[in-house]
Amino acid sequence: MLTISNKGWLFTSILSALMACTSLSTDIYLPAMPEMGRDLNGDAELTLTGFLIGFALAQLFWGAVSDKIGRKKPLIMGVVLFIVGSVGCALSSSMMELLAWRVFQAFGACVGPMLSRAMIRDLYGRTEAAKMLSTLAIVMAIAPIAGPMLAGHLLVWYTWHAIFWLLVAIGILMLIAVLVIPETHPLEKRSKKSIGHTYNNYWILLRNKGFMKYTLCVSSFYIAIYAFLTGSPYV
């Protein structure tokens, strides 16, 4: 199978696209939320909440799995889940159905930004990793701007379903890209302990006051962001 250099520009571009996956999934359909609410007779804001719940829970799973079996397989599985979830969203005929598929979609979308950071950690030292993360952050900043603009143009000609079909197409392109990137977490560096042992470490972190202080600060920041995103389509 064709592979690419793990430190070339193409590899960086793929990681940037994976990092932007979450921002695109949450922001691209914001202009369509009022139409979705009317069409499905429900609160479209719940689909954003459902996505965030799925995204948060999925991190606990994919992180432990990727330390055990490597980065590439979870990436492939996650992107496939994202594609299937996006198809489900596009075909949804009720708000509850759409909500369920959004949670499912989030389980796949989570792998992009999470494992991109892990792959950078695998390949780079502290200084280089900081530079790479800065580069990827630029793309993450562009996605929330470009997504709603693109969706707004789509809604001129099509219904809200087209936005999720666009995410399907993006997911397929991401899957092709993921298939050619190299594995960055070699066998000798993978965790030899059980996944259950990793979950025990989560409890250790939750009992660490320093960790929880930083976590609450970051959480408060994102609460404000998503509160704004939820209400912005109706302003």
What is each residue range found by the language model?
Residues L10-N41, W62, F228-P233:
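Extracytoplasmic
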Residues G85-A90, W101, Q105, V178:
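MFS-fold secondary transporters
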Residues E97, S134-L179:
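Helix-loop-helix hairpin linking two adjacent transmembrane segments in secondary transporters
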Residues L2-I4, H185-T215:
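Juxtamembrane intracellular "pre-TM" segments in multi-pass secondary transporters
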Residues A32-A58:
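Extracellular/periplasmic helix-loop-helix junction of adjacent transmembrane segments
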Residues N41, G70, L91-E97, G108, ...:
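Helix-breaking motifs and short loop linkers at transmembrane-helix boundaries and internal kinks
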Residues W101-I142:
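Cytoplasmic helix-loop-helix junction between adjacent transmembrane helices
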Residues L57-M96:
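Conserved MFS/SLC helix-loop-helix module at the cytosolic interface between two early adjacent transmembrane helices
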